[in-house]
Regions:
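N-terminal segments that cap or nucleate solenoid repeat domains
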Residues: 2-63
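Short glycine/acidic-rich loop motifs that flank beta-strands on beta-rich extracellular proteins
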Residues: 26-31, 46-51, 65-73, 85-92, ...
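Conserved small/polar residues in nucleotide/adenosyl-binding loops
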Residues: 212
Length: 212
């Protein structure tokens, strides 16, 4: 079952440089930044605004450019909005906490290690959360979520609503509570998945599973 040594979000207690009430656009405007807090900042179309960064906090920010957070370590994202253009926003990163945030962009997370999502709405969750491990979700809603959580590992989910097919395929060590999952072809090729107090609605569930 769940790995007792799992590591979700671990805050970094360092003094941070503050950036407030401004905007950026273009290619990599904040590349390789460290110990940074953004408040009321807009990232306009461009690419990789905060690539290769660490210990970043973003509060009440809006993201419109693609790939804003790639190869990051230590992210706190709170009360933010990711527009459709901010596709594939957080990839190849570790140690993320996101709360009270709306995501309108597809393919949001990929190859993550250690992430906590609290009160998050994903309106276009297509191909989201692939190859993510050590994840905790609390009160998360995902729509248009085809292929959500492909190859996920060590996941603890409570208070979850999903509309999307082919979810949780090839997942391992997953606990789900208080969920409403509308998904055909879900839980294929999974191992050690436990679902409590939930509704799972869809055809062809759980083919070729290990322990469940």
């Amino acid at each position: 079952m769940m790995n007792s040594k799992r590591t979700f979000y671990q805050p970094i207690t360092m003094t941070k440089k503050m950036i407030k009430n401004t905007s950026y656009e273009g290619e990599r405007p904040l590349f390789a930044s460290h110990h940074l807090r953004l408040e009321d900042v807009t990232i306009y179309p461009g690419e990789s605004a905060l690539k290769e960064c660490s210990d970043i906090e973003a509060v009440r920010c809006e993201f419109r450019g693609k790939y804003p957070f790639w190869h990051n370590d230590g992210l706190l994202i709170e009360n933010c909005l990711f527009r459709e253009g901010a596709r594939a926003a957080i990839w190849y990163s570790r140690n993320l906490r996101m709360k009270d945030t709306r995501v309108e962009a597809p393919k949001m997370f990929r190859d993550m290690d250690g992430m906590v999502l609290e009160n998050v709405v994903l309106t276009d969750a297509l191909e989201c959360c692939w190859h993510c491990r050590n994840a905790e979700l609390r009160n998360v809603q995902a729509d248009k979520g085809d292929y959500l959580f492909m190859h996920g590992e060590n996941m603890d989910i409570d208070g979850f609503r999903l509309n999307g097919n082919y979810s949780f395929q090839y997942c391992r060590n997953v606990v789900i509570r208080n969920a409403e999952i509308h998904s055909k072809d879900a839980f294929w090729n999974t191992e050690d998945v436990t679902v409590y107090d939930s509704v799972v609605d869809g055809e062809y569930l759980g083919w070729q599973i290990g322990r469940a």
